[in-house]
Regions:
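Helix N-cap/capping motif at the beta->alpha junctions
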Residues: 3-12, 34-36
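As written
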Residues: 34, 66-72
Length: 96
């Protein structure tokens, strides 16, 4: 598990390290939001890394924007740990 505190740090990690198997990201982050970070990450990785959004933002515009980015999953906070586990299992069982 690699923890990045903001979108810029996550992109820096992707530029200089082996790609992770999964990115779990909030939409509302400092410096660069999760949507912008995902767009840039997809350019860096060719969209090869599934992104699971875990966020308190549940308005229709945000959800649809994440879907257009081909988000692998979307969990609204607050959540139970079993939701994360279930989504990660689902993603890894069917991701490309």
């Amino acid at each position: 598990v690699i923890l990045c505190k903001c979108g810029k740090q996550a992109l820096h990690y992707l530029e200089h390290n082996e790609f992770p198997d999964l990115i779990i990201m909030d939409v509302d982050m400092p410096e660069m939001n999760g949507i912008e970070t995902t767009m840039r990450a997809n350019k860096l990785t060719g969209g090869r890394i599934p992104v699971l959004f875990v966020t308190a933002m549940c308005d229709a515009h945000t959800v649809m924007t994440c879907r257009r980015l081909h988000a692998a999953g979307y969990i609204v906070r607050p959540y139970k740990a079993i939701y994360i586990k279930s989504e990660v299992e689902r993603i890894f069982s069917g991701w490309r």
